Amino acid sequence: MIRQELSTSYQELSEELDQVVENSEQADERDKETVKVHGPGILPALDSESASSSIRFSKACLKNVFSVLLIFIYLLLMAVAVFLVYQTIMDFREKLKHPVMSVSYKEVDRYDAPGIALYPGQAQLLSCKHYYEVIPPLRSPGQPGDVNCTTQRVNYTDPFSNQTLKSALIVRGPREVQKRELVFLQFRLNQSSEDFSAIDYLLFSSFQEFLQSPDRAGFMQACESAYSSWKFSGGFRTWVKMSLVETKEEDGREAVEFRQETSVVNYIDQRPAAEKSAQLFFVVFEWKDPFIQKVQDIITANPWNTIALLCGAFLALFKAAEFAKLSVKWMIKIRRRYLKKRGQATNHIS
């Protein structure tokens, strides 16, 4: 509708301009005939009247020029609004494709006891105890001690090699993070044909889930497939500080991952020379802090903001078109007034 009204207005303007040209030519012929009939005595009146009409014509032209400039300015604003609409839609689609990672922290009083799966091989478990804050000095290193931890033995097939049978020692991890609970384990390896000695271990989220699982071998196969494994070497005390990361996937599933910081301290072996042939392993497991890190992908594109911006852009386009239509009508009105005054002046002169 706006385009039809604009085309009609411009057609009326062109017709009025043709009429102005014809009227101006007829007025010039009348002026010439009047000059011929009345002679040179009427020239001063004609000069003054033509001067005033030229001033009015120049003012009308100036107004028309300003109107045309305003129309061009609003056309430019319309182009900017169209570009903003296009850019807004493209940004919204880009944000939908690339969500932003959000990280938050949840404080807990205690953790669900994790499971610590150890693969000692030929190494023997000498002692396992739960302590709080401080580990007392070793009394008889290398000798069997108390095993006050909850442990389970599981044999299962390696998920990456069906021909390998693995034996895992599952230990219940610490819970009381506020009291700085820790688990201290000691192993002894009498003889080894390997050039380097180390014990593998992996961490999984819940020891209770392992106990309640009807298929513990399958449970450990799934854990080994999902979690990474680490090592601690003999002749050192390895201190492992654990932290928990919960990641929410795009399909809504939640995955749990352990992150750890390790510090290694050299063990000063003061045993008799006859006992030093057996290598000792020391490892400590403790929670780093009472904060669970939660990671999820969020979409920053807000559809309501996009809709509001699009509505504003379309409103600007509508207002610009309406102003252009009113400007054309105003120019036609000014032209009609000028033609009316020009006709009255011509009649007065004649």
UniProtKB/Swiss-Prot annotation:
Positions annotated as glycosylated: N155, N162
Extracellular side: 86-301
Modified residues annotated as Phosphotyrosine in this record: Y10
InterPro entries associated with the record: TMEM206 (IPR029366)
Annotated membrane topology: Multi-pass membrane protein
Chain segments annotated as transmembrane: 65-85, 302-318
Gene Ontology MF annotations: pH-gated chloride channel activity
Modification Phosphoserine occurs at: S9, S14, S24
Reactions catalysed according to its record: chloride(in) = chloride(out)
Signal peptide range in chain numbering: none
Cellular component terms per the entry's GO annotation: chloride channel complex; plasma membrane
Record topology, Cytoplasmic segments: 1-64, 319-350
Domain of life of the source: Eukaryota
Cellular localisation: Cell membrane
Keyword line: Cell membrane, Chloride, Chloride channel, Glycoprotein, Ion channel, Ion transport, Membrane, Phosphoprotein, Transmembrane, Transmembrane helix, Transport
GO annotation, biological process: chloride transport
Keyword Chloroplast listed: no
Similarity section: Belongs to the proton-activated chloride channel family.
Protein purpose: Chloride channel gated by pH that facilitates the entry of chloride ions into cells upon exposure to extracellular acidic pH. Involved in acidosis-induced cell death by mediating chloride influx and subsequent cell swelling.
Protein name: Proton-activated chloride channel
